[in-house]
Regions:
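The serine-hydrolase catalytic nucleophile loop
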Residues: 32-45, 67, 209
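Conserved alpha/beta-hydrolase
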Residues: 47-65
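Catalytic histidine-centered segment of alpha/beta-hydrolase-like enzymes
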Residues: 228-239
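Alpha/beta-hydrolase active-site loop
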Residues: 68-98
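Conserved alpha/beta-hydrolase "acid-adjacent" motif
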Residues: 204-210, 233
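Hydrolase active-site cap/lid region
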Residues: 118, 122-170
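Short beta-strand/loop motif that positions the catalytic acidic residue
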Residues: 190-191, 196-199, 203
Length: 250
């Protein structure tokens, strides 16, 4: 995979499509959190389906600069899209790629599912896939307890992941406001036809009921599974690819 930097801070891996087509179709992948960047295999799969793929790290996470959650992660996606008109430069050998996407799609899971849903508010984004997405941060107290016994979640992240996430207590607490990076806060702006969600009813981290309620309130299509836990985005996309491809093309 190639590497590029956008807006000075945002580092991303990217791949061109395996076969060039008449249309430039781009998929942007949004990671969960906390997680280790390992969607390279998914990026390769999507490249073989003839899509450009960009796999960014949020500001303040992993290779990217900045402070995590200083800005809403979906703004990182918007900023990345802003720079595409300039083309993409591989930082390793300086090779330049021209990319003027005719269609832009976003795929995100869990924490990144919120980024995908909020990215759908951008008119340049045609469709998004949200896999076991966080749609309302009111779930935070219970989900934190499911992940760690540390009462200070941001402190846990700093201890467990070091500088992989430059996360302050103040920035983490912004999620509890109900307005910051929260799809539910934007329910009135959602275009239901742009979003497809996948979720398992036995998810231990993101309650199915919260996603079902979001789907009912917005009209967004939700494909449910009886079992599966906290679904892997890579496995979901590959297993459901024919469904996703049809959704993208309509």
């Amino acid at each position: 995979m190639f590497r590029a930097r956008f807006k000075k801070d945002i580092v991303a891996e990217f791949l061109p499509p395996a076969r060039a087509g008449k249309k430039h179709k781009l998929i942007i992948l949004c990671d969960g959190m906390p997680s280790i960047p390992r969607k390279q295999a998914l990026a390769s799969f999507l490249s073989r389906q003839d899509y450009w793929v960009i796999y960014p790290r949020y500001r303040g996470a992993w290779e990217s600069g900045g402070q995590f959650l200083e800005k809403s992660p979906h703004e990182d996606i918007r900023d990345l899209i802003d720079e595409l008109a300039q083309g993409i430069r591989d930082v390793t050998f300086g090779r330049r790629f021209a990319l003027s996407p005719d269609e832009i799609f976003v795929i995100g899971g869990s924490f990144g599912g919120a980024a995908a849903i909020l990215s759908s508010l951008d008119a340049r984004v045609k469709k998004v896939i949200a896999n076991c997405p966080v749609v309302d941060w009111s779930i935070l107290p219970k989900s934190e307890k499911a992940e760690t016994s540390n009462p200070n979640y941001a402190a846990y992240i700093r201890e467990a992941f070091g500088n992989a996430y430059r996360l302050s207590d103040r920035n983490w607490k912004k999620l509890s406001s109900g307005k910051f990076y929260n799809p539910t806060h934007h329910i009135g702006e959602i275009t239901s036809s742009k979003i497809l969600m996948f979720h398992a009813k036995d998810d231990p981290y993101v309650p199915y009921a919260s996603v079902e309620r979001f789907a009912q309130r917005t009209g967004v299509k939700l494909k449910s599974f009886l079992r599966g836990g906290h679904l892997s985005t890579e496995r979901t996309v590959q297993k459901q690819w024919l469904v996703i491809k049809k959704f993208f093309e309509t």
